[in-house]
Amino acid sequence: MLSNLMSWHITLPIALAAAVIGYLFGSIPFGLILTRAAGLGDVRSIGSGNIGATNVLRTGNRKLAAATLLLDALKASAAAWIVGYFLGEEAAIIAGFFAFIGHLFPVWIGFKGGKGVATYIGTLLGVAPIMVVLFAAVWLAVAFTTRYSSLSALVAMLVIPVALLILGNEKVAAVMAIMTVISYWKHKANISRLMGGTETKIGAKG
Protein backbone atom coordinates (compact mmCIF):
# COMPACT_ATOMS: atom_id res chain seq x y z
CA MET A 1 0.00 0.00 0.00
CA LEU A 2 2.78 2.44 0.94
CA SER A 3 4.67 1.59 -2.24
CA ASN A 4 1.58 2.45 -4.29
CA LEU A 5 1.27 5.76 -2.47
CA MET A 6 4.87 6.67 -3.21
CA SER A 7 4.91 5.48 -6.83
CA TRP A 8 4.03 8.68 -8.65
CA HIS A 9 5.24 8.52 -12.24
CA ILE A 10 4.45 12.08 -13.29
CA THR A 11 7.31 14.26 -14.50
CA LEU A 12 8.06 17.61 -12.88
CA PRO A 13 7.12 19.75 -15.92
CA ILE A 14 3.74 18.02 -16.23
CA ALA A 15 3.14 18.29 -12.49
CA LEU A 16 3.93 22.01 -12.58
CA ALA A 17 1.66 22.54 -15.58
CA ALA A 18 -1.16 20.70 -13.81
CA ALA A 19 -0.61 22.77 -10.66
CA VAL A 20 -0.68 26.09 -12.51
CA ILE A 21 -3.76 25.20 -14.55
CA GLY A 22 -5.56 23.90 -11.48
CA TYR A 23 -4.68 26.96 -9.43
CA LEU A 24 -5.87 29.37 -12.13
CA PHE A 25 -9.19 27.54 -12.43
CA GLY A 26 -9.64 27.41 -8.67
CA SER A 27 -8.78 31.04 -8.08
CA ILE A 28 -11.76 32.33 -10.06
CA PRO A 29 -13.85 34.03 -7.32
CA PHE A 30 -17.32 33.13 -8.56
CA GLY A 31 -19.03 34.25 -5.36
CA LEU A 32 -17.62 37.74 -5.75
CA ILE A 33 -18.23 37.87 -9.50
CA LEU A 34 -21.86 36.75 -9.21
CA THR A 35 -22.80 39.05 -6.33
CA ARG A 36 -21.29 42.05 -8.08
CA ALA A 37 -23.00 41.13 -11.36
CA ALA A 38 -26.32 40.89 -9.51
CA GLY A 39 -25.83 44.35 -8.04
CA LEU A 40 -25.38 43.05 -4.50
CA GLY A 41 -21.98 44.63 -3.99
CA ASP A 42 -18.91 42.99 -2.48
CA VAL A 43 -19.80 39.75 -0.67
CA ARG A 44 -16.60 40.14 1.36
CA SER A 45 -18.17 43.07 3.19
CA ILE A 46 -20.91 40.98 4.80
CA GLY A 47 -21.11 38.03 7.16
CA SER A 48 -17.88 36.10 7.43
CA GLY A 49 -16.26 38.05 4.60
CA ASN A 50 -15.96 34.77 2.73
CA ILE A 51 -16.45 34.42 -1.04
CA GLY A 52 -18.08 30.99 -0.78
CA ALA A 53 -21.70 29.93 -1.22
CA THR A 54 -22.55 30.06 2.49
CA ASN A 55 -21.68 33.73 2.69
CA VAL A 56 -23.36 34.48 -0.64
CA LEU A 57 -26.51 33.00 0.92
CA ARG A 58 -26.34 35.77 3.52
CA THR A 59 -27.26 38.23 0.76
CA GLY A 60 -30.68 36.57 0.79
CA ASN A 61 -30.34 35.34 -2.78
CA ARG A 62 -30.62 31.55 -2.67
CA LYS A 63 -30.31 31.09 -6.43
CA LEU A 64 -27.07 33.04 -6.43
CA ALA A 65 -25.75 30.97 -3.54
CA ALA A 66 -26.65 27.76 -5.37
CA ALA A 67 -24.95 29.02 -8.52
CA THR A 68 -21.84 29.88 -6.50
CA LEU A 69 -21.77 26.42 -4.95
CA LEU A 70 -22.15 24.77 -8.34
CA LEU A 71 -19.52 26.88 -10.08
CA ASP A 72 -17.03 26.57 -7.21
CA ALA A 73 -17.38 22.79 -7.45
CA LEU A 74 -17.26 22.65 -11.23
CA LYS A 75 -14.12 24.77 -11.51
CA ALA A 76 -12.23 22.05 -9.63
CA SER A 77 -13.90 19.26 -11.60
CA ALA A 78 -13.18 21.02 -14.89
CA ALA A 79 -9.54 21.49 -13.99
CA ALA A 80 -9.19 17.80 -13.12
CA TRP A 81 -11.10 16.60 -16.20
CA ILE A 82 -9.29 18.82 -18.70
CA VAL A 83 -5.83 18.23 -17.27
CA GLY A 84 -6.54 14.53 -16.87
CA TYR A 85 -7.64 14.22 -20.48
CA PHE A 86 -4.43 15.72 -21.82
CA LEU A 87 -1.85 14.88 -19.15
CA GLY A 88 -3.09 11.79 -17.34
CA GLU A 89 -4.64 10.65 -14.07
CA GLU A 90 -1.88 11.80 -11.73
CA ALA A 91 -1.92 15.24 -13.32
CA ALA A 92 -5.69 15.36 -12.77
CA ILE A 93 -5.21 14.72 -9.05
CA ILE A 94 -2.64 17.51 -8.85
CA ALA A 95 -4.89 19.89 -10.81
CA GLY A 96 -7.81 19.18 -8.49
CA PHE A 97 -5.68 19.78 -5.43
CA PHE A 98 -4.38 23.09 -6.72
CA ALA A 99 -7.87 24.18 -7.78
CA PHE A 100 -8.76 23.70 -4.11
CA ILE A 101 -5.72 25.76 -3.10
CA GLY A 102 -6.63 28.42 -5.65
CA HIS A 103 -10.11 28.74 -4.18
CA LEU A 104 -8.73 29.13 -0.67
CA PHE A 105 -5.98 31.55 -1.68
CA PRO A 106 -6.94 33.33 -4.93
CA VAL A 107 -4.22 35.60 -6.23
CA TRP A 108 -6.74 38.03 -7.75
CA ILE A 109 -8.24 39.12 -4.41
CA GLY A 110 -5.31 39.14 -2.04
CA PHE A 111 -5.22 35.38 -1.37
CA LYS A 112 -8.38 35.60 0.76
CA GLY A 113 -10.83 33.01 -0.51
CA GLY A 114 -13.33 30.46 0.68
CA LYS A 115 -13.17 27.47 3.01
CA GLY A 116 -12.98 24.90 0.28
CA VAL A 117 -16.01 22.64 0.75
CA ALA A 118 -17.38 23.13 -2.77
CA THR A 119 -13.98 22.73 -4.43
CA TYR A 120 -13.32 19.69 -2.24
CA ILE A 121 -16.49 18.13 -3.65
CA GLY A 122 -15.53 19.27 -7.14
CA THR A 123 -12.11 17.66 -6.87
CA LEU A 124 -13.77 14.42 -5.76
CA LEU A 125 -16.10 14.61 -8.74
CA GLY A 126 -13.09 15.01 -11.00
CA VAL A 127 -10.88 12.21 -9.66
CA ALA A 128 -13.13 9.82 -7.67
CA PRO A 129 -16.75 10.59 -8.61
CA ILE A 130 -18.37 7.74 -6.67
CA MET A 131 -17.04 9.35 -3.48
CA VAL A 132 -19.35 12.32 -4.06
CA VAL A 133 -22.26 10.01 -3.26
CA LEU A 134 -20.62 9.02 0.02
CA PHE A 135 -19.84 12.65 0.84
CA ALA A 136 -23.47 13.62 0.23
CA ALA A 137 -24.77 10.68 2.29
CA VAL A 138 -22.56 11.53 5.26
CA TRP A 139 -23.36 15.24 4.99
CA LEU A 140 -27.10 14.58 4.93
CA ALA A 141 -26.95 12.11 7.83
CA VAL A 142 -25.02 14.51 10.07
CA ALA A 143 -27.11 17.51 8.99
CA PHE A 144 -30.33 15.63 9.71
CA THR A 145 -29.21 14.63 13.21
CA THR A 146 -27.39 17.82 14.27
CA ARG A 147 -28.60 20.59 11.90
CA TYR A 148 -25.04 21.91 11.70
CA SER A 149 -23.91 22.52 8.11
CA SER A 150 -20.28 23.06 9.08
CA LEU A 151 -20.12 19.89 11.19
CA SER A 152 -21.71 17.92 8.36
CA ALA A 153 -19.00 19.04 5.95
CA LEU A 154 -16.22 18.46 8.48
CA VAL A 155 -17.36 14.90 9.20
CA ALA A 156 -17.79 14.12 5.50
CA MET A 157 -14.30 15.40 4.73
CA LEU A 158 -12.93 13.17 7.48
CA VAL A 159 -14.68 10.08 6.13
CA ILE A 160 -13.62 10.47 2.49
CA PRO A 161 -9.84 9.86 2.82
CA VAL A 162 -10.48 6.83 5.04
CA ALA A 163 -12.94 5.38 2.53
CA LEU A 164 -10.53 5.97 -0.35
CA LEU A 165 -7.74 4.27 1.57
CA ILE A 166 -9.93 1.26 2.33
CA LEU A 167 -10.82 1.02 -1.36
CA GLY A 168 -7.13 1.04 -2.28
CA ASN A 169 -7.00 4.48 -3.92
CA GLU A 170 -3.98 5.59 -1.90
CA LYS A 171 -2.89 8.53 -4.06
CA VAL A 172 -6.26 10.24 -4.04
CA ALA A 173 -6.71 9.34 -0.36
CA ALA A 174 -3.45 11.08 0.52
CA VAL A 175 -4.33 14.22 -1.43
CA MET A 176 -7.85 14.38 -0.01
CA ALA A 177 -6.43 13.91 3.50
CA ILE A 178 -4.18 16.93 3.00
CA MET A 179 -7.15 18.91 1.69
CA THR A 180 -9.17 17.86 4.73
CA VAL A 181 -6.49 19.14 7.10
CA ILE A 182 -6.28 22.46 5.25
CA SER A 183 -10.06 22.87 5.21
CA TYR A 184 -10.22 22.09 8.93
CA TRP A 185 -7.76 24.94 9.46
CA LYS A 186 -9.95 27.25 7.37
CA HIS A 187 -12.94 26.15 9.48
CA LYS A 188 -11.20 26.86 12.79
CA ALA A 189 -13.73 29.57 13.73
CA ASN A 190 -16.60 27.16 13.02
CA ILE A 191 -14.91 24.44 15.07
CA SER A 192 -14.48 26.87 17.95
CA ARG A 193 -18.17 27.79 17.80
CA LEU A 194 -19.18 24.14 17.59
CA MET A 195 -17.16 23.38 20.70
CA GLY A 196 -18.70 26.38 22.45
CA GLY A 197 -22.24 25.56 21.36
CA THR A 198 -22.64 28.85 19.50
CA GLU A 199 -22.49 27.64 15.89
CA THR A 200 -25.56 28.58 13.85
CA LYS A 201 -27.80 25.68 12.94
CA ILE A 202 -29.43 25.06 9.58
CA GLY A 203 -32.68 27.00 9.39
CA ALA A 204 -31.85 29.25 12.33
CA LYS A 205 -32.74 32.90 11.94
CA GLY A 206 -30.71 35.90 12.97
From Swiss-Prot:
Reaction(s) the record says it catalyses: an acyl phosphate + sn-glycerol 3-phosphate = a 1-acyl-sn-glycero-3-phosphate + phosphate
Entry's Gene Ontology molecular function annotations: acyl-phosphate glycerol-3-phosphate acyltransferase activity
Pfam families, A to Z: G3P_acyltransf
Topology class, membrane: Multi-pass membrane protein
Cellular component per GO, a single term: plasma membrane
EC number(s) per entry: 2.3.1.275
Compartment(s) where it occurs, according to its Swiss-Prot or TrEMBL record: Cell inner membrane
Biological or metabolic pathway of the protein: Lipid metabolism; phospholipid metabolism
Any single biological process term in GO: phospholipid biosynthetic process
Keyword set, alphabetical order: Cell inner membrane, Cell membrane, Lipid biosynthesis, Lipid metabolism, Membrane, Phospholipid biosynthesis, Phospholipid metabolism, Transferase, Transmembrane, Transmembrane helix
Bilayer-spanning residue ranges: 14-34, 67-87, 91-111, 124-144, 148-168
First and last residue of the signal peptide: none
Subunit structure: Probably interacts with PlsX.
NCBIfam families with a match to the protein in the record: glycerol-3-phosphate 1-O-acyltransferase PlsY
Known function: Catalyzes the transfer of an acyl group from acyl-phosphate (acyl-PO(4)) to glycerol-3-phosphate (G3P) to form lysophosphatidic acid (LPA). This enzyme utilizes acyl-phosphate as fatty acyl donor, but not acyl-CoA or acyl-ACP.
Family in the record: Belongs to the PlsY family.
Protein name according to UniProt: Glycerol-3-phosphate acyltransferase
Taxonomic source organism: Rhizobium etli (strain CIAT 652)
